[in-house]
Amino acid sequence: MFKTKRSLLNSSIAISFAVLGVQAQAETLELQAESFANSGGTYSDGQPNPVTIYNVNGQGAINFVNAGDYVDYNINALGGEYDIEYFVGTGVTSGPNIEVLVDVNGTWQSQGSVAVPYGSWDDFQSLTPSHTVTLPVGTSTVRLLAVGSTWQWNLESFRLTQVSPVEPVGDADNDGVNDNQDLCPNSPSGVTVDNNGCQITGGTDPGGESFVIQMEAFDSTGSDDSRAKGVIIGERGYPQDKHTVVDSVQTTDWVDYSINFPSSANYSVSMLASGQTDHATAVLYLDGTEINEVPVHTGSQADFANFQLAGSVYIASGTHTIRVQAQSSTGEFSWLWFGDALTFTNLDSDGGNGGEATQDADNDGVLDSSDSCPNTPTGEPADVTGCSASQLDDDNDGVSNNVDQCPNTVAGTEVDADGCEVIFADADNDGIEDSQDFCPNTPAGEAVNNSGCGASQLDADNDGVTNNIDQCPNTPAGTQVDASGCETDNGGEPGDSYYHNGQGLLFGRVDGATNFLGEEGYVANPDNYDVTTDLLETDDAIRANSTEVFRGEIYDADGHIAFYEHIDDSVRLYIDGQLVLSNDSWENSSQTTDLNLTPGWHNFELRLGNADGGSGAVSGIGFGIDVDGGTNFVHPSNLSPSMFRASGQVVVDPILPPSGGIYIQLEDFDETGTVGRVASDPNDGFVKGDSNVGWVTNGDWGKYHNVFLEAGTYRAFITVSTPAGGSYGARVDIDGEPFAWGYFDSTGGWDIAAEYELYGGHLVVESTGNHTLHVEAVGGSDWQWSGDLVRLAKVSDSAVKQPRVYNPNEHIVAEIQGPATGLQYLKTPVEIPLANKVLKSDVWYTYPQNRNLVVDGDTPYADFGATGAFWGHPPEHDFYDDTVIMDWAVNVVDDFQSEGFEYTARGEFDWGYGWFTEFTTNPQPHYVQTLDGRNVRMTFMGYLSHDGYNNNWLSNHSPAFVPFMKSQVDQILKANPDKLMFDTQTNSTRSTDMRTFGGDFSPYAMENFRVWLLKKYSNAQLVSMGINDITSFDYGAYLRAQGITHTDWSNAGDTISGNIPMMEDFIYFNRDVWNQKFAEVLEYIRQQRPNIEIGASTHLFESRGYIFNENITFLSGELNLGARTSISELPTNILVHLKGAQAVDKTLAYFPYPWEFDELRIQNAPRFGRGWVAQAYAYGGLFSIPANVWVGGEVFTWSPGADNYRDIYQFVRAQANLLDGYTSYAKAGYVHAMFSSMKAGFIDGGNQVQSSVKILTEDNINFDMLVFGDAGYPVVPRQADFDKFEYIFYDGDLNYLTAEQQAVLDAQGSKVKHIGQRGTIAGLQINVSINGSVSNETVSAVSRIHETDSTAPYVVHLINRPFAGGVTPILNNVEVAIPASYFPQGVTSAKLHLPDGSSSTVAVSTNANGDTVVSVSNLEVWGILELAH
C-alpha cells in the first residue's frame, strides 16, 4: 500500500481539501523504495517475498532483488515528460539493469533501461539515465524491473522530476470530467455524473461522496485506564503492503479528530484496521455520544480489513469531534488493534433525483428529510417526527420516556434515576441529608461542614477538646492538654510524666538492636514515652541500635485475627505472653495464620529492633492486621483506634528536640539551583516567598553564606509543608560536606507546616566561624516541600568526626590509556577448574531464599534439583559494618552452602548506590553529570534515596570508582561465596545511551577525555578539530559553545546521529576507560581467588559497555524475551544473546525483565515460560527458576506455579551428561558487526542481526557468530575461528566493517556468501517435517557436540516453538532429517529423551537424499536426541 503522508495539521483543514479535490502542484515526485504497492518475481533466493525490505543507517530500502523481480508504485502526477533518478547500489560488477515501465490502459509500456554501476550493496549512489518517463495526468502505476544478471541491485528511493508538462485540458460543463474524456459534454449544472461525464439517474443510490481520515493524524489521544498511555504512530502489514497506523492500542485508549463536515447528512463510517485479539472492539463517539461498538479482528497484525463503525449516523454540517476508542468485549486489559484510516461516506447525496433525498437512514419509517431524531435505535417504534421513547423526555426532567416511572414531574423538581421526585430527609435541619450526615444531632443554628458536623462535634487535633472551645487547635498527637485544649506544663524535662488510661498503645524505646526476651540486656518494662493510636511509628525509621516497644491490649471481636510484618531488621510479637511472630530477616516478610483467640481483650506487645538507623517498612506496610484472620492485611492506622487500649505512666522522651539554636530562614538564600530534573517544574532551584521557599522539587538547593557556628555537635531540624502523600527528605551540607540528612512523611498538605529532625549524618562542626550551608531536597518524590527554616541546636562541644571508609590518599589512580590501535582479537576466558565451573546442567534459584518459599504450607521448589543460586544479594545498607557482613556470611551464605548449594554473590552498580554513599559519605562529586550540569538518576530502578543522597549514577571516571569496586570485593569475599557476579550492565557507559540519560560530562570525565584525545591525535590533528589547547579543553563547554543542548546530545547519542562533533570518539573513550578500570578490579579478584568464576551482565549487543576481558568467565543478567509482542511462539531475539555468549566462549545465565512474566500473568499463560527455559538450555545457557517472580506495579510478585516448571528443571539435571561439556556445532558462520548494536535502540542488537538470526533459525541452519568489533576496538576472528565453518554468511550490516576488517573477511574467499544465497547450499540444514511437510519454523533442531570427547554421542535438541493459549501443542509424526555429511561421523542409532522422564530408542532410516531420518512422537516443548555414531 503506497500512502502519501500529509503533515499532521488540524484534521478539519485536511478534510476540507479532501472534499473539494484540491491537489498540491508538485513538480518532483520522490518515492521511497520500500513503499511499493506490489511486487513480483520467480527467482528462488530463499526469501518469503520476491523482494525484501531492510534498513541501512536508519533508511528503509529493498534488497534480494533478482533478475525478473519487479516492484510497482501507485503515483498521482501532473503528467508529461519526467527525468528519473535512482538512488541505488550493487555489489555485482556487471549485468544489473533497471528498466522502468508505465501501465497505460492495462499494458506495460517500457520507458527505457539503464545499467547499474558496480559499487556497494548499501552505498546508494545517484543514477540518472538518459531516457525520460512519460506519465499521464492523475493516477498511474510505475514498475521498476530488474533485468540482466541473477543478482541485481538494492534501492533506497527514486525521484521523478517533470521536464515537460501536459497541455491543460478544459472542462466546459464544469462536471469534473475533462473535455477529452467527457462523453456527455453539456451536462446540466449541479447534476451527479459518472466517470464518462454522463448524468447518473434513477433510484436512491447514494452518490458515495466520501472522504478519508488517516488515523495517525489524530488531534489528541489518551486512555481511561492508568495502565495505558494512549496510542503511538507505527507501521504494520506485510513488506509489500505497509500501513501507517495508530499503534500500541490498549484497552480504553482513544483517538480524537476535529473534523469539518461539509454538509448535513447521514454518513456511514468505516475503519480500515487489523488485529489478532479476538475480544477487541472499537467504539465510535460523535461529540461525546456513543454511536456504536463493533468487533475488530482479522486474525493477524498484517491483514487489514474495513469495519463498519456506523451504518448510518446523522451529522450536521460544521466541525465535530469524532472519537474512536478501543475496548474489550471481555473487559480484559490487553493490546487490541491497529487503525489505518477512517472513511466517511455521505449517504444523502441525491443520486440525480433532482434535489431531495429519499432515504430513511435509521429505518424508523420517517424519511430523513422529516426525521427529528435521525439515529433512532433499531427496533424502537417512532412517532411521526421520527423519535422513539428513548429519544424523548416529555417532562424535561432529564430522564427519557422509556425509563421514566413518573412521567409528569413538575418542572424544576429534583428526580432520581427513575424520574421520580427525591424526598429530602434532614432530621437536625442542618442542610445535610440524613444519609450523608455523620453528626445527626447538630445543635440548632450551628454551621456544619459537608459531613454535617459542627465545631462542637469535631476534635481536629484529637486532644479530647472539641473545636469550638479548643484554644490550641493544632496540638501534636499524644500531648497532655488542659480544658482549653492547650499543653499542660510538665516542665519539658526527662522524668516528668502523666498517667494514661484509655485508647492506644504505650510506646517506648530501649537500647540494643535485639532487646527481646531471652537476649542479653533485655528490659522487660521500659519507660513509656508516648501513646500511639495509629501505630504509624511502625513505618518510620527506627533509631540506630535500639528496639521500639508497643504495649497494651488489643480487642478481637470474633476470635479471628492474623498479623503481618515487613520491617527492615528484627520483629517479635507477643499475644498474651506467647510469641506469635518472629523474624530477623531484613528482606523477607512474615505473617501468622488465624490465631483463633477467645473473643475479647488480649495482652499485646510488639518489639521492632534495628541495628543501623535505616530501618522501617521495606515495601508496602510495615505492620499489618487482618481482623478476620485471613491475609487481607491493613495497617492499624486504617482500623478503629478503639481496638487498642493501655494504661501506664508516660514520661518525657529523653531524645525530644532541644529548644532554640541557630535559625536559617530558607527564603534568605544567597544562591540557588538544582542537580535534579523535574519536567513539570519551570524553575531551577528555590522560589522565594514572603516567609518561605516554594516550588521545591527533587535536587533543588539553596546556599547560605556566612552562617556563624560554634564548633561542636548539633541536632538539626527543618520546618516544611508537603503534599498529602509521597516520600520527602532534606540534606544539609556545611562547607561542601554532608552534615545532616533525614527523610519524613507528609505534613498533610501544602498549608500544614511541621518541624522534622534531620537525624542522619555526623552533625559535627569542626571549627568556630562563618560557614556556607547548602540545603537540598532529596527523597523519592519529584515534588518535595515548601520550606520555612532550618534550625541547628548545639548539644555538646565535641567536634570529632568518625573517619570515612574512603580515603583518596590511600589509593593510586592509574593514568588513562589511549585507544586500541590495529586489529584486535577476543581473549580466551581464563580456564577455571571443573569443580568451580558453571556447568551447562546447573539449575539455579533466582534468589537463594526461593528454595524455602512456602506455598500453602509446602516448599514446592525444594525438589527442582537446584545446584545453586543466581542473585545472592549482600545487605543493602551498613555494607561496611563487619557485624552486618558476617551476619550475612553466616546466616545466609554459609547456611545456603551447608545444604549443598553454590552461592553466587552479586556485586552492584545501580543497587549499590547506597553502598557508594556509605563508602564516600559525600558522593556528589563522583556522579555522572549531564551537559547541563544535572545528576543522572537511575529512574529505571525507582526513585530511591539513602543517607541523604538519591540513586544517582556513579561515574566510571571518578577516582573513587576502582577503590569502591575493590571494597565490594573485599566485603563480599568475607562470606566466601562460590562465584561472583557483577551487574555491570548499569555502569556509566550506559549513560551515553538512551534518550532519558544524556552522557557523562562530569569534571572527571572531561579530564580523562583530554588525556585520551592527546593519546589518539597529534597536535596538528587536534587543532584541525578546533582544539587549540588540549590542556584546558573541556568537551562539554566546547559543545555548549556551539549551541548543543542536553536534549540535542541525548537524541543524537541514542543512535549516534545528528552530527555532534566527536560523538563517536566520546563513546569509544567511555568504553575504553570503563574497560581499563574494571579490568583492574577483575585482576584484583583474580589475585585473591585465582579459580573463582566471575560473571558480569555485559553483552556484545550492548556494545557501548561491553567488557573485553578474559577474567570474566560467564555472562549474566536480565534480558528481554518479547512476551508483550507475542506468546504464540517462542522468541528468537534472545537467541542473539545466546549466540553472542557462544561466540565469546562464555555461558549465559539469565532471567527475563519483570514485565515478561507480568505479561504471562496478565494473559494467564504461566506455562509459556517452559519454552523460555527449554530454549535457554538447548542453546547452552542457564535460565534461573521462576519461583516468586517480581512483576512490579501493585501486584509486586507472582508465582507462575512450581508444577508448571518442575519437570523441565528435573529433566536438565537428569540429562546432565548430554549438556555438560557440550558446545554448539554448526557448519555455517555468521558475520556480526558490533557497531550495528551501537546504533540500536535497545540491548537486543540492530534490526538486521535480529532478522538474520530469525531467518537462519527458522530455516534450521545451525550457525555460530563471527564477531567483528567497531572502529573503536576493531576485533576480528582468528583464522582458527573461520576454519570451523564451511560457509560464512554476511548481511546488510557488512557496511559497518572497517576496511581492515573487510580485508580479513575477504581473505576467506568463496566460502563467504550473502545470507540470501543460503538456500542454494546443500548440507547445511537439519530439516524437520511434521506429517510429511517441512516445518523448520515449527521445530528448531539445535545441534551440539562434546568439546573434548569425540566418541561421545552427538546431540540434537528439538524445540517446539509454537504455543496455543500459552500451552505447547504436542506433536506426533515428526521426522528429523540430518544430512549424511552433517556430523563428522554417520549416525547409527538414536534415543529420544523427554521432560516427562521417558527415554526411548527411536527409528532411524535413510531417505532418498541419503539423509539420516529420525522419527519422533509425543514432542511437547523440548526433546533431546542422543545420536550414536
Curated annotation (Swiss-Prot):
Residues 369-378 have a biased composition (Polar residues). Inactive above 60 degrees Celsius. Optimum pH is 7.2. Active between pH 6.0 and 9.0. One of its GO terms (molecular function) is carbohydrate binding. SUPFAM superfamilies: Chitinase insertion domain, Galactose-binding domain-like, TSP type-3 repeat. Its cofactor is Ca(2+). Keywords: Calcium, Carbohydrate metabolism, Glycosidase, Hydrolase, Metal-binding, Polysaccharide degradation, Repeat, Signal. InterPro entries: CBM6, Cellulose-bd_IV, Chitinase_insertion_sf, Galactose-bd-like_sf, PA14/GLEYA, Thrombospondin_3-like_rpt, TSP_type-3_rpt. It catalyses: Endohydrolysis of 1,3-alpha-L-galactosidic linkages in agarose, yielding agarotetraose as the major product. Residues 490-638 form the PA14 domain. Residues 29-161, 211-345, 662-793 form the CBM6 domain. Residues 349-400, 474-495 are annotated as: Disordered. It comes from the Bacteria. Homodimer. Belongs to the glycosyl hydrolase 96 family. This is Alpha-agarase. It comes from Alteromonas agarilytica. The lineage of its organism: Bacteria, Pseudomonadati, Pseudomonadota, Gammaproteobacteria, Alteromonadales. The gene is agaA.
